[in-house]
Regions:
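Binding-site signature for planar aromatic cofactors or substrates
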Residues: 1-276
């Protein structure tokens, strides 16, 4: 277990985690103008001018290893509207909580500006297979038919959360991976926020002398600590950060730190309690 440098992960890591979860995202594309456009098979077709911008939903975002470039899954019709040579676009990702009673709450916003490009159909299928090894997702099953993979060459990243607005350099995103517990966080929030589980109320006593009127909510778990939402008797809500004594790298270490925050022993007698 390595020492904890700060109470929260770095901005680039928080942004990387939000992109991997991709709870709710849209891609803002400029409307096509009259002329021709490229298609995923390399041919060209005539287009009619239209007004307004297209904002297709993004079903998945995957960062290419070692770079800040992103592969995005969007509807085929919207991908076909991207001209040859690409077009500047904006990806907006709402990092919504995916588990527990706070499901659907937005905790941060990630905005990525860059050049979005088409990928030919054959390369899309190969890329989808490669992505599935790292990020299995049902959104990849439709690639090549009702959905398409496009590439976003990242130029600028903005992260907005409780810490304020942070401008993240593409190189920082390229060298930062998501939190190691990103994929499982939603399941743990479901379990730990269960009314039958008393772990969250015990943690809440570390930041308030008595329990608030409403049951405290665990709204975030990462390698560096947990986030709680507390509501007082007047209905005012506030968020509290409880950092771990040491950063976690695997599930066993995370279970240890969660128990210590709740006032438990480092090594429980019940082996089942080793799990978060």
């Amino acid at each position: 277990m390595r020492s904890l440098v700060g109470p929260v992960p770095e901005p680039a890591e928080r942004a990387s985690s939000a992109l991997r979860r991709c709870a709710r995202a849209t891609l803002s594309l400029p409307a096509p103008t009259a002329g021709t456009r490229g298609t995923t098979d390399g041919s060209r077709e005539n287009t009619a001018g239209s007004r307004g911008n297209a904002t297709p939903a993004v079903a998945l975002a995957h960062r290419t290893s070692g770079t800040a470039d992103l592969s995005l899954v969007i509807p085929t019709a919207d991908a076909a509207a991207i001209p040859a040579g690409g077009v500047h676009a904006r990806l907006e990702v709402l990092d919504e909580i995916l588990g527990g009673a706070a499901r659907g709450w937005c905790r941060r916003l990630v905005v990525v500006d860059g050049l979005v490009e088409q990928i030919d159909t054959r390369a899309q299928r190969h890329a989808a297979t490669r992505i599935a090894r790292d990020l299995p997702d049902s959104a990849l099953l439709g690639v090549g038919s009702e959905s398409a993979l496009v590439r976003l060459r990242t130029e600028r990243i903005l992260l907005t959360d409780d810490s304020g607005v942070t401008d993240i350099a593409p190189d920082d995103l390229a060298t930062s991976g998501p939190d190691p517990f990103t994929d499982l966080e939603g399941h743990w929030l479901d379990h730990l926020n269960d009314p039958r589980c008393q772990v969250v109320p015990r943690r809440a006593l570390r930041v308030c002398r008595c329990l608030p009127a409403e049951r405290p909510l665990l709204i975030g778990i990462d390698r560096a600590g947990v986030d709680l939402e507390l509501t007082d008797r007047e209905g005012r809500a506030r968020r509290e950060r409880l950092p771990f004594a040491e950063a976690c790298t695997d599930v066993a270490e995370l279970g240890t730190q969660l128990r210590l925050l709740a006032g438990g022993a480092r090594y429980p007698q019940d082996r089942a309690a080793l799990r978060p």
